[in-house]
Amino acid sequence: PNLDHNPNTGGMGGFSPHPWLDGELKDKIMKKIAIPTVRGFREATGHSYVGVIYFGLMISEEREPSVLEINVRLGDPEAQVILPRLETDFFQLSEALLDGNLGSQTLSWSKDYCLGICAISGRAIKPLTSGTAGGGERPGYPGEHYTNMPISGLEKVDPEVLVYHNGTAFGQDAARKKRLFTTGGRVLTLVARGESLAQ
């Protein structure tokens, strides 16, 4: 409760599977949120919804779900920690979705855990030179943050770790060397996999 005053941001990390998400909670989410949403869409538009629906939920201590947001796309960084565990062919699922045969598909999941964390544009550690992205102090993401900052160290990342580029672009540094630069607040998501969450 003492930490509930911080701003709602884009996802800063995640892990999958979640230990709270048991059969009882899944049923509650389906009955209270997912099925009424899809049914309401059909009643309001006369069309069946075909695609991905992402429900951003908050689960209370009483295990009651509340909706924060609904998107018609995969969540970010949620997809980065969920999809590596999917063993069913994603293209096959997409085809079945478009053909109206998704109900015939069986999803197969790895028992491994995936944990992801976002590297963000934070507060500058030292004042920037006047020619760099406007200079001056900035608080960092989710507030005003620096862009066009060089990214280094990716060659040191364990090869088993997945690196997703969220806010990066190639450019040239002062020596005209091609390298990665930041373009947004959430810059990279690094996802590791293990047999347990602790691993």
Language model: regions and residue ranges:
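ATP-dependent carboxylate/phosphate-activation module, predominantly the ATP-grasp catalytic core
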Residues: 1-33, 72-86
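Short, well-ordered beta-strand elements within core beta-sheets of diverse protein domains
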Residues: 14-17, 117-119, 186-194
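Active-site "cap" helix and flanking loop/linker of ATP-utilizing ligase/carboxylase catalytic domains
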Residues: 30-53, 71-158
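Protein kinase-like catalytic core scaffold
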Residues: 53, 66-68, 186
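Short, surface-exposed charged micro-motifs
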Residues: 56
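Short acidic-glycine loop/turn motifs at beta-strand connectors
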Residues: 59-63, 121-122, 172
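Generic long, charged, amphipathic alpha-helical segments
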Residues: 145-189
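Short amphipathic alpha-helices within nucleic acid-binding modules
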Residues: 196-198
